[in-house]
């Protein structure tokens, strides 16, 4: 979206941080208003993450105004809130392409800009990376400042506290900014706290504090009394005792929407030594009333008209796989009071809103704590309950040791409902569910199910729920196929697939069998019709249907495996391992996700580019057969 200078006269003068820093401080509030208006207009036309960015406009302006970025290194945790940062770092004109194929990356991305220090997408990584940068900056005596911005949700993850604990121990010069937009830590925002922040971050207080420590170094009793008195006074008005105990100098809470106050506080803190912690209070969706009232709905938005003060309603078409899972939970919980549903902060995305309201005593949101979520489930399983962990494929990676150590080794009946398996689309490399079959297939005791449609998904969820060991059902983001769902549930036989189509080739030509794992079944059948190939819906990536495999390999000349998972180590690799072990030598073409991190784009665009749509599957098979 090109910039209308008449509507954004100050923003037009701040295309880069150098230009921003040349502006008079008095112009910053007006700049924030223009930046917020531009962000709203651009995202409403292109879709993307909105509410988080609206909430950090003043913080973004203040950080780039005070610090000499990119020499000073600024890291945004997760990255949903980084749209204002992209606008102010030379990418304003391209913002309308964000999350689109060949467009701006949805998150800060090192290959995209020198201002993006860390490529992000998952939460709670910023403090660890900032600490590493700060350590190296001190070793090089670079006088470089390192800043990490983390939200009140992301800071609850264990990794963030591990980094805080380490930083407090080794005492590097670094700043952690806590963007608190949920009132989860404190509500003490106002003039008193802003004044207190000025005093506590100011040079006079700092010099008195440090000087007093030196004078009293020889009198430990008085020194300890003074330290406790300081902590007691600060503890009465400041919710930062925990961070002080971790070794940080805590400042705040500060009004995160007062840009001049932020600039003053950051300038005071810029030259302080040791680990610093600035706590700011913001409102997610700030400046656009519907987003302020409903920040969850406006977190990620489709294209919409801001003047309508509402988002477009869904067409009410095909249900999503997440909906299928949510309905399954509710149906099962009616008759199973030992069903326990666990999610690491993905209630809405995993389709669990209805369940959380109808069965609150059986619903557990662990916040951003995937490791804890998995081991929590193991404890419930040991107690004789039936836990189900609803988790995105990309986030299950974060609980891998717990999956092995706390579930699989004990062969506990924990089911993993793995959403966003395969290509997720606009969120790009960090969110593609490309590896779960590969990293689960090597774990003993695991059962891995790959439904081809929503009805099969429902039956597999039931199968996993009734299974006496660990199991996983993986399904993609987005709409299902639209077939009628059988409300009656019946457990499938573990490790058994089914034939969908049989070739009619008898004498001429090579007989091809397509072994489908997952929701590419319709694409496989369409390609098979053109090739007159056999199609098997394998259903289970582990254990494989060895009987069906033996039948197919003896009656066909070529096998083709297809899955929406990395080819390396995936279901196709399992097929080859079985054939080699049993000396069944036949050529096997493996189709799936290549050995690369796959960028953003729609699911349809990426399937076509990777030749995993029906046309691409047919072409890859023809090329392999040299037809």
UniProtKB/Swiss-Prot annotation:
Pathway(s): Metabolic intermediate biosynthesis; 1-deoxy-D-xylulose 5-phosphate biosynthesis; 1-deoxy-D-xylulose 5-phosphate from D-glyceraldehyde 3-phosphate and pyruvate: step 1/1
Binding residues for Mg(2+): 152, 181
E.C. number(s) listed in UniProt: 2.2.1.7
Pfam family, one: Transketolase_C
Alphabetical keyword list: Isoprene biosynthesis, Magnesium, Metal-binding, Thiamine biosynthesis, Thiamine pyrophosphate, Transferase
Transmembrane segments: none
Cofactor(s) it depends on: Mg(2+); thiamine diphosphate
GO biological process, one term: 1-deoxy-D-xylulose 5-phosphate biosynthetic process
Cofactor note: Binds 1 Mg(2+) ion per subunit. Binds 1 thiamine pyrophosphate per subunit.
Enzyme class: transferase
Highest rank taxon of the organism: Bacteria
GO cellular component: cytosol
Catalytic activity entry: D-glyceraldehyde 3-phosphate + pyruvate + H(+) = 1-deoxy-D-xylulose 5-phosphate + CO2
Disulfide bonds: none
Signal peptide: none
Residue positions binding thiamine diphosphate: 80, 121-123, 153-154, 181, 288, 370
Gene3D superfamilies (alphabetical): 3.40.50.920, 3.40.50.970
GO molecular function, one term: thiamine pyrophosphate binding
Subunit note: Homodimer.
Entry function: Catalyzes the acyloin condensation reaction between C atoms 2 and 3 of pyruvate and glyceraldehyde 3-phosphate to yield 1-deoxy-D-xylulose-5-phosphate (DXP).
Sequence similarity: Belongs to the transketolase family. DXPS subfamily.
Protein name: 1-deoxy-D-xylulose-5-phosphate synthase
Annotated organism of origin: Aliivibrio salmonicida (strain LFI1238) (Vibrio salmonicida (strain LFI1238))
């Amino acid at each position: 979206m090109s910039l209308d200078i008449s509507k954004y006269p100050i923003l037009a003068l701040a295309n880069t941080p150098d230009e921003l820093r040349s502006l008079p401080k008095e112009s910053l509030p007006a700049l924030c208003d223009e930046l917020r208006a531009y962000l709203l207009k651009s995202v409403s036309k292109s879709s993307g993450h909105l509410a988080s960015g609206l909430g950090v406009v003043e913080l973004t302006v203040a950080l780039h105004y005070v610090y000499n970025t990119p020499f000073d290194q600024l890291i945004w945790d997760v990255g949903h809130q980084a749209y204002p940062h992209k606008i102010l770092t030379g990418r304003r004109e391209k913002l309308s392409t964000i999350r689109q194929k060949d467009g701006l990356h949805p998150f800060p991305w090192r290959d995209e800009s020198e201002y993006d220090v860390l490529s992000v997408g998952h939460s709670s990584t910023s403090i660890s990376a900032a600490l590493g940068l700060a350590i190296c900056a001190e070793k090089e005596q670079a006088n470089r400042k390192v800043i990490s911005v983390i939200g009140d949700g992301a800071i609850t993850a264990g990794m963030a506290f591990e980094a805080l604990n380490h930083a407090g121990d080794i005492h590097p010069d670094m700043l952690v900014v806590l963007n608190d937009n949920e009132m989860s830590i404190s509500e003490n925002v106002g003039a008193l706290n802003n004044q207190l922040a000025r005093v506590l971050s100011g040079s006079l207080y700092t010099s008195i504090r440090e000087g007093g420590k030196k004078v009293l170094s020889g009198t430990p009793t008085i020194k300890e009394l003074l330290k406790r008195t300081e902590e007691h006074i600060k503890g009465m008005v400041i919710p930062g005792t925990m961070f002080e105990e971790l070794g940080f100098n805590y400042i705040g809470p500060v009004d995160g929407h007062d840009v001049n106050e932020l600039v003053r506080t950051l300038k005071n803190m810029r030259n302080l030594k040791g680990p610093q912690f600035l706590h700011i209070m913001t409102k997610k969706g700030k400046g656009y009333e519907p987003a302020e009232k409903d920040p969850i709905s406006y977190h990620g938005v489709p294209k919409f008209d801001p003047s309508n003060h509402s988002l477009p309603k869904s067409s009410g078409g095909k249900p999503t796989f997440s909906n299928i899972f949510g309905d399954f939970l509710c149906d099962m919980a009616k008759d199973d009071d030992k069903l326990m549903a666990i999610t690491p902060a993905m209630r809405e995305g995993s389709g669990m809103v209805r369940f959380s309201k109808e069965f609150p005593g059986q619903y557990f949101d662990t916040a951003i704590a995937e490791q804890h979520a998995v081991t929590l489930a193991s404890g419930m399983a040991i107690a004789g309950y039936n836990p189900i962990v609803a988790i995105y494929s990309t986030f299950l990676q974060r609980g891998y040791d717990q999956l092995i150590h706390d579930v699989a080794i004990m062969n506990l009946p924990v089911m993993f409902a793995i959403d966003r398996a395969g290509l997720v689309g606009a969120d790009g490399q960090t969110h593609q569910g490309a590896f779960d079959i590969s990293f689960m297939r090597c774990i003993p005791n695991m059962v891995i199910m790959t439904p081809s449609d929503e009805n099969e998904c429902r039956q597999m969820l039931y199968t996993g729920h009734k299974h006496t060991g660990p199991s996983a059902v993986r399904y993609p983001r987005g709409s299902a196929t639209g077939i009628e769902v059988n409300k009656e549930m019946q457990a499938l036989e573990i490790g058994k697939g089914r034939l969908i189509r049989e070739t009619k080739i008898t004498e001429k030509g090579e007989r091809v069998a397509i072994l489908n794992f997952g929701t590419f079944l319709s694409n496989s059948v369409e390609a098979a019709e053109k090739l007159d190939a056999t199609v098997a819906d394998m259903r289970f990536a582990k254990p494989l249907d060895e009987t069906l495999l033996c039948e197919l390999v003896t009656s066909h000349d070529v096998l083709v495996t297809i899955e929406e998972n990395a080819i390396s180590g995936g279901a196709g690799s399992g097929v080859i391992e079985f054939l080699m072990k049993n000396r069944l030598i036949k050529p096997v073409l493996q189709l799936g996700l290549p050995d690369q991190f796959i960028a953003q784009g729609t699911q349809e665009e990426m399937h076509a580019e990777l030749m995993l749509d029906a046309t691409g599957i047919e072409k890859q098979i023809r090329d392999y057969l040299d037809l």
